[in-house]
Regions:
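Alpha-helical packing segments of well-folded alpha/beta enzyme cores
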Residues: 1, 39, 43, 104-115, ...
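Substrate-binding/active-site clefts of carbohydrate-active enzymes
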Residues: 1-153
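Carbohydrate-interacting/catalytic domains
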Residues: 1-2, 267-270, 281-289, 293-511, ...
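Conserved, mostly hydrophobic/aromatic
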Residues: 8, 27, 47, 108, ...
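Short, flexible loop/turn elements at secondary-structure junctions
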Residues: 12, 31, 60, 130, ...
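Short glycine/proline-rich turn/loop motifs
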Residues: 24-27, 88-100, 144-145, 251-263, ...
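Conserved alpha/beta catalytic core and glycan-binding cleft of carbohydrate-active enzymes
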Residues: 120-122, 137-303, 311, 332-389, ...
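Long, intrinsically disordered low-complexity tandem-repeat segments
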Residues: 503-504, 524-608, 613
Length: 622
């Protein structure tokens, strides 16, 4: 089948069959259900002789309450907490280890090392890590006690996991630690010295839930759930993930993998399942598939019954198994599918916006520049006879696997001929090819660049290598110079002090320059502000001047009014003069009358001597 490892459900001794081995009582004993300890050693050796590694499921998160187990081991709470809010797990009805006790921590760490030392296990997969990390896991308010900081993190369990990983990897025997952690706890696969828990891999439960939900949809409605297909790549490099379809997904009424697929017939369901497995193989991360799902077992897994091996007599199941076998061999023979699982340079979207067509196109790369695979996954029930897509470089593209091949139960809508790229821009790439895409299918192409493209890649690779070498040599030279200086300083005991004094002097000069610059800038700002204030001050003065001028104009306006008053008085005098003329009997020259200022009283007093009076008046006028 081409598998590289097998992961066994817990083989430690346990009393309850229905627990599947997850309620362990004999941590240091292989279960007697399958034979003796020697039989188990033989099994491990045989698997290794066939090139298959063995990973064991291990349960340090909780243990059963059975009296013949670890509960109240000596009549007191030795392994568990005395306070039931800390030591009881209501979700499973089991007890929780007191990880803060050194005796308990050492017991569990020694047990993990026991299985790698005595039985040569290639890895340990830890169950229910999330229940260890959170004090309130599976509990209601009032059923748990906060940590010393008032939070829900189990600080003692966190330290236990870090200590375990440090000791485990300190053996340097190549064994790996895998965490089944279903929350967003950060740095599960980070190094303990960097604040991580120290695991090598983490199950990607988020991808499993999203992708399973997407595949359950009818193909017509998948375009509305396109995000469930592509979302995982947003966090794919936050941890070292393993993509899993485990036993938890095919029990408790969830149905088998083929049972989750839409389709009116078993063949249609198998068509969807093949596309799903193809996408899983191309997606970054290690892969895990539960037994029976590689030949499309119809029923859920039942711990009380064997797998339905008889189904292999039917073509659809045999063809599904052949397809999974082909995928596994493709995985093992192409480093692009595993070498750069946790390096963003190993993956590139060609197009992840075909939501209306329910398609994704991407490439996988290896550490070698010429190792590239192109994946085209169609989750829609529509076929594309001439589908153009962008390719990463000019070259030849050969289809090496197609889930719609007749040998796997498909319709045979494949691409038997090698495709040569054309210099036609597509998907924002300079080159493109045209292929046939079957409905519900996944096809994989090997990519061979042209000689010119190879030369360009080699030149780029040479430049990159040269740059890296130069940086390394420069760093080495700097390191060597620093070491020489350190040695000289150690010998003389003076150079270090001089360097410090010199550096302090340089810093002092720099600070002095900065201070001068700061003072100058402050002075400049102050002068600018003074100028602005002066300008603002002159403006009121101008306004005052304008106000005075306005007052003068108002005064001038008043003077004409005075003149008008005088004019009225003259008019009154003229009226009186006319009246005086009427009183006189003599004729008077108009010119003389108009210029005289006559007093009416004098004119009327001497009526008998008019000539004398008028002559006198004439002299006064002159």
């Amino acid at each position: 089948m081409g598998y590289t490892h097998v992961e066994l459900l817990p083989v430690m001794e346990h009393p309850l069959d229905a627990s599947w081995g997850y309620q362990v009582t004999g941590y240091y004993a292989p279960t007697s259900r399958y034979g003796t300890p020697d039989d188990f050693m033989y099994f491990m050796d045989y698997m290794h002789s066939q090139g298959i590694g063995v990973i064991l499921d291990w349960v340090p998160a909780h243990f059963p309450r059975d009296a013949h187990g670890l509960a109240c081991f000596d009549g007191t709470c030795v392994y568990e907490h005395q306070d039931p809010r800390k030591g009881s797990h209501p979700h499973w009805g089991t007890l929780i280890y007191n990880y803060g006790r050194p005796e308990v921590s050492n017991f569990l760490i020694a047990n993990a090392l026991f299985w790698t030392d005595k039985y040569h296990a290639d890895g340990i997969r830890m169950d229910a890590v999330a229940s260890m990390l959170y004090l309130d896991y599976g509990k209601q308010d009032g059923e748990w006690v906060a940590n010393i900081y008032g939070g829900n993190e189990n600080l003692e369990a966190v330290e236990f996991l870090k200590h375990l990983s440090s000791v485990f990897h300190g053996r340097k025997d190549g064994a790996v630690l895998i965490a089944e952690e279903s929350t967003a706890w950060p740095q599960v696969t980070g190094k303990p010295e960097d604040g991580g828990l120290g695991f090598d891999f983490k199950w990607n439960m988020g991808w499993m839930n999203d992708f399973t939900s997407y595949m359950r949809c009818d193909p017509y409605f998948r375009k509305y759930n396109y995000g469930e297909l592509t979302f995982s790549m947003l966090y794919a490099y936050s941890e070292n993930f393993v993509l899993v379809f485990s036993h938890d997904e095919v029990v408790h009424g969830k149905g088998s993998m083929i049972g989750k697929m839409p389709g009116e017939t078993l063949e249609k369901k198998a068509q969807n399942l093949r596309a799903a497995y193809g996408f899983m193989t191309g997606h970054p991360g290690k892969k895990l598939l539960f037994m029976g799902q590689d030949f499309a077992q119809v029923d859920e897994w039942n711990e009380n019954a064997s797998l339905e091996w008889n189904l292999l007599e039917y073509p659809v199941h045999q063809q599904t198994q052949d397809y999974v076998k082909a995928l596994n061999h493709l995985y093992r023979t192409h480093p692009a599918l595993y070498e750069m699982d946790y390096d963003p340079e190993g993956f590139q979207w060609i197009n992840c916006s075909y939501d209306q067509d329910s398609m994704v196109i991407f490439i996988r790369r290896s550490k070698k520049a010429d190792e590239t695979l192109l994946f085209v996954c169609n989750f829609d029930n529509m076929a594309h006879e001439k589908f153009r897509l962008g390719v990463p470089f000019a070259g030849k593209y050969k289809e090496i696997l197609n889930s719609d091949a007749e040998e796997f139960g498909g319709t045979g809508m494949t691409n038997p001929r090698v495709k040569t790229s054309k210099a036609m821009e597509w998907d924002e790439l300079e080159n493109s090819i045209e292929i046939r895409v079957a409905p519900m299918s996944c096809c994989v192409f090997s990519c061979t660049p042209t000689e010119e493209e190879k030369a360009q890649k080699n030149r780029k690779g040479t430049k990159t290598s040269a740059a890296k070498t130069a940086e390394a040599s420069k760093a080495s030279e700097n390191s060597g110079a620093e070491k020489k200086e350190e040695n000289a300083a150690r010998k003389t005991g003076v150079r270090t002090v001089k360097d410090k004094v010199r550096k302090l002097a340089e810093k002092k000069d720099e600070l002095g320059k900065k201070a001068v610059q700061t003072v100058e800038s402050v002075q400049k700002l102050a002068s600018e502000k003074v100028e602005k204030l002066t300008t603002r001050k002159t403006e009121p003065e101008k306004l005052a001047t304008k106000k005075v001028e306005a007052e003068k104009l108002t005064t001038k306006k008043v003077e004409p009014e005075k003149l008008s008053t005088k004019k009225v008085e003259v008019e009154k005098l003229s009226t009186k003069k006319v009246e005086a003329e009427k009183l006189t009997t003599k004729k008077v020259e108009p010119a003389k009358l108009s210029t005289k200022k006559v007093e009416p009283e004098k004119l009327t007093a001497k009526k008998a001597e008019p000539e004398k009076d008028f002559g006198k008046n004439d002299d006064e006028d002159k």
